[in-house]
Structures are given as structure tokens and as C-alpha cells.
Amino acid sequence: MSQVRSKSQQGKRQAKPQEVVPATILTEQLSTYAFGTVTAGAVMVAVAAWMGGSLASIDERIQGGLDATAKSAGFTVTKISIEGLDPRTKADVLNAVAIPVDSNMFRADPFVIKERIEASVENVSEVRVLRQWPNDIWILAENRRPLALWQTDGEWKVVDQVGKPMDGEDPAEYVELPRVVGPAGGYAAPELLAQLKLHPQISEHLEVAMRVGGRRWDLRLDSGLEIALPEDAQVDEALLAVYNLDEATGVLAEDSEVTRIDARDLERFAVGLGEARAAYDQSSQIDDKSGGA
């Protein structure tokens, strides 16, 4: 009897509601099934080649089978879209991609395409390649643009918006750009200059920024004022504190007697006057030769 009741109770249980499968999972599953279909087709072609052809032509027939199966399943490249570049650079990128229309979509490896572009096209930065299934390839990139002049090992270089040197660019043609000096200064420049943009009372008067110890900056303004910043993680806070100090006292004014602001300790600023500046100039690694390109 106990077994009968158990079955009766089981019969009264409500069926579990079906779970809704997210669209992203369905898309991944469809891609997996499609890849399985292509692979299965390739295996059949390989067997046929082994049975009826020479060993030398097996690989060619396998590849042909993959392409034919992908095409019949609708997985071919029909469009390559390039965004973020000027027309001339777009043409260079398209040539570097080297993927004809109607090619097997599975062959369009985003990592390989990215490597081709970066190796062949000099004037690009921040390259991303995406496959939009089943037929489109999207290439997103930026034209490299000069951001700053960087002096390293006694030589000036032009660096782009991500801090990479732009070989072939003449620094003499970019004398209006901000200047940074010191080891790894070029690579750290984009972050500093982005932070300084929020403080035009400093950025518009920046003469040179010196990288110190690979972790912080000293700034020299065209008025002669020098600002020692803390480590990179605290630069935003330090610049805001300097701004507040200027609002209260006018330390950044051209006729200010302040010649140095030590903002390395956010709890207590040190302000230098007169002779303090001369002492600092003598110890600074920025000399007259590094002040011009």
C-alpha cells in the first residue's frame, strides 16, 4: 500500500516549468552545431580523398570540403566593415586583411587578422576585430595621432595617444606638443596628459614633465613654477588640491612668489620661495638642453 500511495503522490506532482535559454547561449549552441556540421563534412571529404585520390591532394580536398560545407551552411564572409579610420588607412587595412568575399567565415580568425593589420599598417592603434555571425567582419581601430614629445637617452621622439613612439615622425614638426622626459615617460604620458586636461591652469602652461622613478611626475610650468606630484594613483587628488590652493592663494599666478609646490604628501604641501627654487634647479635632471626639441 505504501508503494501505491507513493506512486499516487508522484502523479500529483506538477511538472517543472521549462527554463528559458538566454539568446546568447542559443547563439553559441548554433555556432557549435554549425562548426560540427562543417567538421563532419570535412571528415567525409577526407575519407573520400583517401579512398579515391593521392595523398598529396588530401589536404587540398579537406580545405575545399570545409569551404564548400561552410558556404552551403551560409557561413561565408559577405561584408568587411572598418570603423574609426580615414579613407586611406581603411584601404591599407583592407589590403592587409587579405580575406576575399565569400571566404569561409571560420577561417576569418580575429587574432590572425589583428596581427596582420598591426604588422602591415603603421598608422593604426587600438585594433579590435570581431566576427558578426554568420557573414560580417567588423574592424575597429584608430588612426595614430601625435600626443607628446618624449626625450629618452638624449633623443626626442614623437609618441602617439597610447604612448608608443611613432617612428619616422620628425619631432621638429611637433614643437607645440607637450614634452615629457625620463625613462618610460612616453608610455606614461597619455594618462598624465588626460588628467591635466581637467586642469587647464596647469596644462596650458606646462613646459615639461619629468618622469621620476617610473612611478610619479615633476612638472615645470612656463612661469618657472615646479610641482612635485605624488605616485600615479594619487595624481588626480593632488591636482585637485593644487587647484584649490590656487583658488585660495593664487599660487599659480604668473607674478606669484611661489617657485615650488611639493604635493607628494597630500596631508601637507610644502611651498618653496626664492632660493629654494635655485637649490631645486641645481638638483633637477631637467637642464636647458632638455627644454627644447
UniProtKB/Swiss-Prot annotation:
Highest rank taxon of the organism:
Bacteria
The UniProt entry, under Gene3D superfamilies, shows: Cell division protein FtsQ/DivIB (3.40.50.11690), membrane protein fhac (3.10.20.310)
All copies of the POTRA domain together span 75-144
Q: In what way does this protein cross or attach to the membrane? A: Single-pass type II membrane protein
Q: Where in the cell is it found?
A: Cell inner membrane
A Pfam family (short name) is: POTRA_1
Q: Which residues lie on this side of the membrane: Periplasmic?
A: 53-293
Q: Which residues form a coiled coil?
A: none
Q: What is this protein called?
A: Cell division protein FtsQ
Q: Which organism is it from?
A: Hirschia baltica (strain ATCC 49814 / DSM 5838 / IFAM 1418)
